[in-house]
Structures are given as C-alpha cells and as structure tokens.
Regions:
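Catalytic core of pol beta-like nucleotidyltransferases
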Residues: 1-26, 35-40, 51-107
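Glycine-rich beta-strand-to-loop/alpha-helix junction loops that act as flexible
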Residues: 30-32
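Short beta-strand->loop micro-motif that forms the acidic, two-metal-ion catalytic signature
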Residues: 45-48
C-alpha cells in the first residue's frame, strides 16, 4: 500500500533545500515507497536533482542534504544527482533504477 503522505514529506524537504539556497530541479522518490512495498520502518529514498551536483560534490553539500533531511523527516535518505547526470549518466545503477521506477516531484 502506498503511503500518500510520502510525496508531501519529500516536497517539504525539497522546499527546505530551496530555502537554503539549493537550486532543485526535481526530486525523485524511488525504492520501496515508489513500488508500494514500504513498511512503517522503510526509509524514503530520494534523489535530489540539482545543477549544483554536476560539479564535484563537497562534504558541505552532503552535510547540507542530511541536516535538512533530519529536520524534515529522519527517514529521508537524500542522494545528490546533477542535472546533466540525471539526463545523461549511463553508469550509475541508483540513477538508472530511479529513472525506471521513480516518482518525480517538483520542489
């Protein structure tokens, strides 16, 4: 059964990132929540697509994603993905799975 609260949680998280200065093109929920197989213990797998992440990612970028996640909902597992990477990458298994099964969200 799909938890209908998850997209709202993810959108609020993306909006929090925007308020912190991150240009977010989209979020993509994938994994058990996208497949409708989540349990109450499932995390929220969320790709954050931003041109900011096309450049080499810094520890500060990763810390920002995780700190915002903890403040919104500790189940969020943010994964940074560059805009170009989202469109063109053919080597990342996670990106490929998210493209195939993911549910896209606008921030």
């Amino acid at each position: 059964m799909v938890d209908t609260t998850i997209p709202g949680i993810a959108r609020r998280y993306l909006q929090r990132l925007v308020s912190l200065g991150v240009v977010v093109e989209r979020g993509v929920i994938f994994g058990s929540h996208a497949r409708g197989e989540a349990s109450k213990w499932s995390d929220i797998d969320l790709i954050v697509v931003s041109p900011r992440f096309d450049a080499p990612r810094t520890r500060d970028d990763i810390n920002l994603l995780w700190k915002a996640a903890v403040r919104e909902d500790s189940r969020i597992e943010p994964i940074p993905c560059g805009s170009k990477e989202w469109l063109e990458d053919k080597t990342s298994a996670i990106v490929e799975i998210a493209r195939r099964e993911g549910k896209e969200l606008a921030p």
